[in-house]
């Protein structure tokens, strides 16, 4: 009886392992379709190195990688936007965008919408330029980790004083 359960477990592992080879993420097939469309399978594509992969390899910390990934995702969204009306790759683009939504935005629609909103701002629009410059000081303050830590320490210090009084 004991050997039978081992054999069944072994067979299950073999079946699941073989299924894993055939159950690729949907984006893989669609990315291959885009490679054919853009003629990105030719060896000359690799000339002069990679666009993104070397940059991603340079950064090991999660927060640093997220910054780089956000710029890369932004690039792909702009690329896809340029080809949104091409019916030959419409399905591939939509599938990949959905997969990015799951992997990068954790299926959070609000994050995705805000990200797209940011990537759609035109830097040549005078009104956008004026608003961006108007908000620059506040944005810079948000970027500074020292300011956030200082605020947190002060608020903890005041909370401690109130509790002891």
Swiss-Prot record:
Name the keywords, alphabetized.
Antiviral defense, Cytokine, Glycoprotein, Growth regulation, Pyrrolidone carboxylic acid, Secreted, Signal
Q: Where in or outside the cell? A: Secreted
List the InterPro entries. Answer: 4_helix_cytokine-like_core, Interferon_gamma
Gene Ontology CC annotations of this record: extracellular space
The GO terms describing molecular function are: cytokine activity; type II interferon receptor binding
Q: Which residues are glycosylated?
A: 48, 120
Modified positions (Pyrrolidone carboxylic acid) are 24
- PANTHER family according to UniProt: INTERFERON GAMMA
Assembly and oligomerization: Homodimer. Interacts with IFNGR1 (via extracellular domain); this interaction promotes IFNGR1 dimerization.
Name this protein carries in UniProt: Interferon gamma
Question: What lineage is this protein's organism placed in?
Answer: Eukaryota, Metazoa, Chordata, Craniata, Vertebrata
